[in-house]
Every structure is written in structure tokens, then in C-alpha cells.
């Protein structure tokens, strides 16, 4: 081997060691700040693995809302997207809530502009408004009850049959709820860009490659996708399902961040993230992936960016969230 190649190899090893040391130091700094600030890190399953591993609590929207409602921490660092951090602030108006990147929005939340939704609601004033938690604080403030993918079916089932329901903003989750409850819901035409990238073609391809695999999917997917699923559920529900299943191979149809926890829980099993038709990384949420360990550290160090919500919106948005938590207990 030439001296040049040896030197290059040494440089690569040195660089890798430096990166590893920097990573360890970053983790230590985050843990120190967390203790000094009496902070808690809440993270969604769709976050990158490094953030999942440093979180104090990891969960789906319902679990995160419950945790935010009961935390004794002074500062909540929310590793998720904007509407999730807003929910934490609504439940804890006196606490500081930090979001590592304020640009971490949500295509589903953006598909329901408050001004337009307000007019839609007025046109159907006899309807009870049940909104999926994946919406802005302004939409929550116009809602009667909030739901998540984990409890949407149960909540709708608790509403009297004579009461018309307006369900927003996810039409795909709404269609799933209709299929499970038999209710005639009025749906707002919103959707998640990630969960609409999947195709039947790719399901068939993967099923031919892995004939014994079970297909598991999130209810934000389109009906044409869900009809091929052996199991449909929220991220927490999907995780619990693979833990209990006797099957060893799963085709996972949702944002692939959840697979990190599936592999940790069941290292002996195989989890296959269903790709999009184009084969790009479009099944990864671009908003969730804006958060990084470095941004999380900087948010704690600088106490910014903070989530702020006008008091009038905050107070009105809190009622339907609390009603959801009461109905889910």
C-alpha cells in the first residue's frame, strides 16, 4: 500500500473518531443543560434516531399530549413539528416551550387555513367539529373536540348518532373512521403529503419479494393503500402490534422514523419501509427531519425559538384538547 493511501486511511479513521467524540460531547452537553434548566425533551416517533435516543419521552400525538399535560418540567423542548409544540404550549401556557426549528411545519395542518375553515364551519353550523390534532392552534380553537389517530374511532363512537359531525383536516383518517364507525362524517379535504406518496404498485412489488410479510399502515394513508393492510393503527399501535405479532417480517407504510423503535424492540424481526413510486426519500417527512441534535442543543442553550400563542386562541384551543383527554381516559 502506498504512503498516500496509508495516510488517507489514517485521516479517515481520525475523522471518524473525532465525529464520534463530538457526538458524545453533544449528548453530554444536552443532558447537562436539561438538568440545569429542569427541562424535558418530548419527541415524536418520526424524528431522526439520534433525537429519539436522547428524548425523555417518545410517543405518538396522543401520548405526547398526555405527557405534556402532566410534566413538572419548567421547560418543554419539543422535538416534533409546530402543531405538536403548540399543543404542549396550550396545555402549559405558563411554561417555556421550545421547538428546535420553527420551520418544522406540517403539510396536513397547512391544508386547513383558518380563514377558509371558519367559513366552512359557519356553513355547517349544526355540525359538531372534531379536529385531528394535526392542525394549527387556530383550528383547534374553532373545534369542539380534538382527536388523534389513536382515539379518533373511539371518540366518534361516543358522539350521539343524531349529532352531525364535521371532521377535519385529514380526509383519509376521516374515511378510515367512517369505515370503522359507519358514521356519515362531513370531511374537510386535507391530507398529509408523506402518507399520499405510497402506491399499490410498490405494495405488490414488496409482497412478491416478501410473501410472508405482514403489511401494517397508518390511517392517514389513502383507502387504496389501507385495503391491503393486515393491520392499521397509530404509530404507538403499530409498534405494539409488531411486538406482539408472531410474524417476523413487516412492510411498514408510514413515515420510516418509527422503524428505529421497531428494530430496538424486536431486533430479531425485519422491517421494510415501503418506498414511493419514484424511489425517492419522499416517505420521510421533510418537516420532521428539520430538527437535529445540534438544533435541539442550541434551542436549549439560547432558550429559543419559543412557541407563542395569542391568549384568546390559546384559551379556546385548550378546551377541545382537554375534552379529548377526558374522553380518552
UniProtKB/Swiss-Prot annotation:
It comes from the Eukaryota. Its EC number is 2.5.1.72. Its cofactor is [4Fe-4S] cluster. Keywords: 4Fe-4S, Cyanelle, Iron, Iron-sulfur, Metal-binding, Plastid, Pyridine nucleotide biosynthesis, Transferase. GO terms for biological process: 'de novo' NAD biosynthetic process from L-aspartate. GO terms for molecular function: 4 iron, 4 sulfur cluster binding; metal ion binding; quinolinate synthetase A activity. It is found in: Plastid, Cyanelle. Binds 1 [4Fe-4S] cluster per subunit. It catalyses: iminosuccinate + dihydroxyacetone phosphate = quinolinate + phosphate + 2 H2O + H(+). GO terms for cellular component: cyanelle; cytosol. Pfam families: NadA. Belongs to the quinolinate synthase family. Type 2 subfamily. Catalyzes the condensation of iminoaspartate with dihydroxyacetone phosphate to form quinolinate. This is Quinolinate synthase. It comes from Cyanophora paradoxa.
